Amino acid sequence: MSTRLEREVARRRTFAIISHPDAGKTTLTEKLLLFGGAIQMAGAVKARKSGRHATSDWMAMERERGISVTTSVMQFPYGDHMVNLLDTPGHQDFSEDTYRVLTAVDSALVVIDVAKGVEAQTRKLMDVCRLRDTPVMTFINKLDRDGLPPLDVMADIEENLRIECVPLTWPIGMGSDFKGTYNLLKRELHLFSASHHGRIQEGILIRDLDDPLLDEHLGPQADALRMDLALLEEAGTPFSREKYLRGEQTPVFFGSAINNFGVRELLDNFVDLAPAPRPRPAITREVSPHEESFTGVVFKIQANMDKAHRDRMAFMRICSGTFTRGMKLRHHRVGKDVTVANATIFLAQDRSGVEEAFPGDIIGIPNHGTIKIGDTFTESKEELKFTGIPSFSPEHFRRVRLRNPLKAKQLQKGLEQLAEEGAVQLFRPQVNNDYILGAVGVLQFDVIISRLHDEYSVEAAYEPCSIHTARWLHCNDRKVFAEFCDYYSAELAIDAEGALAYLAPNPWRLESAMERYPAVEFRTTREIR
């Protein structure tokens, strides 16, 4: 291993921010970029008068609705480190894309609204983190508003997310009484000072709890802080980086992202504590980031990032070695060598060409329809296939109807390309020519209709269909499986990757099928091929 590769791996930090809608994730993303020097002014998402929009919300529909629909990838330097931040969809209807993003990162940052505590989507996303033992840091946001007591929020996190909480900062007051935070590691006080117009404005440091300045600034809250800290000292759990790296313990930070407060402390601790790129599992072996030979895996496809160019982009996580512009890579699924001359790194929609990139980095490579989610690329000819990138069973279904029959080819192309992105799943029933879309949440259907219109000039509509759920099928007994397929032929469909799925019309029909054919597996997830 070269000394330079070792150094570049050590300075990389690749993570995703996850939260329930409206917990302040997009605002925090903006402020991390602001402190990292990647942008000059935070574009407040809701500040319509200024005409600014959040850097990470670049699709037109996202700007209209104020939600993050796709996953943006942003890279910025911070001190000696290079940070790769994956801003994930915050709306509850966009969680399947978020699930897959969690396969491309080495750690996660969970954002919790202090007034609401743990919410449904956060629980689902933490389940995915737990499957991979992903280290998780927690930022409890909106301390400038009234909310739950800090101990109650942490108890809620421990109970619902099943992870031990250790505060590394502690809030003083809340809402209109919010005075700042105390850093338990550095033993210093950071007084709250609201920012204006997105500019960074630092607080005041007081290092000694016995300093009369503490009482001068906090008044009666000074004694309350001393009591809280004494309680934490006596009853709290000490922070263990080893437990954090194993996904057993989450360090907790408090702040107000919209006011820039607590963000620098969070970022400083993140680059110090979060892991550098880790080994990644493949079918045949584990791949170390320190291996000289390049490997990478595609975890996301985005169509038409620039409408003027009608382009499609494959997002690849570099797993080992060094990427250099113009290098020849083996595309294993199709068995061909490709020369990658124009890879890009993103700041949301702002692209810059890549001369070289290292493990942990996310690069975009142009995709003309040959690259799919889960594809592995290597510098060597070694047969390699990275694992752990799933599809999840949809919860909502719609039948697509075309308003203009002459646009049938455009509809098929649009649906196939959009399904390749992974936001929706496309099913073709075996008994007819219908297009059935399956999604984790209903808002995705609005996105598809909008993008078919804007990007493919196709006017389409939906009809309801009597499908309760989808299950991917597997059976080792060919005779039994053939009998099953014959009996349930009207309820079988092929997905976009050619996998056979059972579209159950109701829970009872699914239960009956499972009882009638116990040798058949009905799977809720499918490894992307």
Swiss-Prot record:
Q: Name one GO biological process term.
A: regulation of translational termination
Q: Which InterPro entries match?
A: EF-G-like_DII, EFG_III/V, G_TR_CS, P-loop_NTPase, PrfC, RF3_C, RF3_dom_3_sf, RF3_GTP-bd
All copies of the tr-type G domain together span 10-278
The UniProt transmembrane annotation reads: none
Primary location class: cytoplasm
Which keywords appear in this protein's UniProt record, sorted alphabetically? Answer: Cytoplasm, GTP-binding, Nucleotide-binding, Protein biosynthesis
Q: What range does the record give for the signal peptide? A: none
Q: Where does GTP bind?
A: 19-26, 87-91, 141-144
Q: Name one GO cellular component term.
A: cytosol
Where in the cell is the protein located? Cytoplasm
Give GO MF terms, alphabetically. GTP binding; GTPase activity; translation release factor activity, codon nonspecific; translation release factor activity, codon specific
- State the similarity comment: Belongs to the TRAFAC class translation factor GTPase superfamily. Classic translation factor GTPase family. PrfC subfamily.
Q: Which HAMAP family match?
A: Rel_fac_3 (MF_00072)
> What is its biological role?
Increases the formation of ribosomal termination complexes and stimulates activities of RF-1 and RF-2. It binds guanine nucleotides and has strong preference for UGA stop codons. It may interact directly with the ribosome. The stimulation of RF-1 and RF-2 is significantly reduced by GTP and GDP, but not by GMP.
- According to UniProt, the name of this protein is Peptide chain release factor 3
Q: Which organism is it from?
A: Nitratidesulfovibrio vulgaris (strain ATCC 29579 / DSM 644 / CCUG 34227 / NCIMB 8303 / VKM B-1760 / Hildenborough) (Desulfovibrio vulgaris)
